[in-house]
Amino acid sequence: MRRRFATVVVLVASLGLLLSGCSADAPEPSATAPADAGAVRNDLQYGTASGEKLLLNACLPEGAKGATAAVILIHGGGFDSGTKDFGGMTALCAELADGGIAAFSVDYRLAPKYAYPAQVNDVTAALEWLREPAQVAEFGIDPERIGLFGSSAGAIIASSIGTKGSGSLNGGDRVAAVVALSPAVDLTESGLLLGDPSKVAIASILQYLGCDDFTECPNARDASALYAVDKTDPPFYIAMSKNELVPLAQGQAMALALKSVGVPVILDVKAGKRHALELLDEATRASIRQFLIEELVTASTRTD
C-alpha cells in the first residue's frame, strides 16, 4: 500500500531540475550554494570518532511544506582522499535541495589511517544522527524517507549500509533507497574474478580493508555488500560503464542478487570508460530523478 504526501506534486515538478550540470570534469564547485537555492549550512558536526569531529554540509529545500525526503551524499576518492566538498558533491547537494529533497554531504574517516569498518560506521552515524528528533525537527525531514547517494568509494559504503541496515526506517540504520555510481560489491579474492579490475582499484580496496593482499584479509567478505543482500534491502539504482575502473561484472552480480530476492533494482550501463560522477549524463540524471521520485517521494513506508 502506498501513501501519498502533500508535497508530492511540488516535489515532482521541482525535481525536473535535479542533477543538472553535475559532470565530473566540471570545475570544483564552491562551498556556497547559488543565491536562489534553499538554505545551506556547512560544517555541522554529526559525531566524533577517534577524537576527530565528523562533519557534514546540509542543503535544505526552500519553502518546503511538510516533512521532506532526504539523501546522504557519500563522496569518492579511493578511500584515502576527498571531502564532503569533493568531486561535485557540493553542487549535487545544492541541486537536490533545489529539487525539493534535503541533502547532506558527509565527511568520513579516510584510509590508510582508518580501515573498514570506520567509513561505514561514520556514515551510519550520520544516518542515525539525522533520525534523532532534534534533527528531524530542525531540518524538516521525514526519517522514513532517507536515501544514500554514493560515488565510487562512496558507492561501496552506500551499498554496504543499504544491505546491512536493520531495524525500522524511523530509528534504525536502514535506508529507503540507494543510488550507487560505480560500486564494487564483492571485495573478496574470488570477487576479483568478476571482470578485470584495474591495479588502481585493487590498491584502493586493499587500503580500505586494511590488508596487504586478499589471501589473508578477514574484512573482505564482511565489507562486500554482495554477501549481505536479502529481501529487506531498499531499492537500488546502480550506474556503471562497460569499460571503467570497476568491472561491470560487479554491478551485474549485485543486480542479479537483488533481483533474486525480489528487491527492485535498476542497472544503468553506459558505453565507454566513464566512472562515478562522469556517468551523470542527461539520460542518467533523468533516470535517477525518476528513481528518487518513486522511492523517496511517492513510495509508501516498507514494513518488512
Predicted regions and their residues:
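Bacterial N-terminal signal peptides that target proteins for export
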Residues: 1-9
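Alpha/beta-hydrolase superfamily serine-hydrolase fold, recognizing
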Residues: 24-304
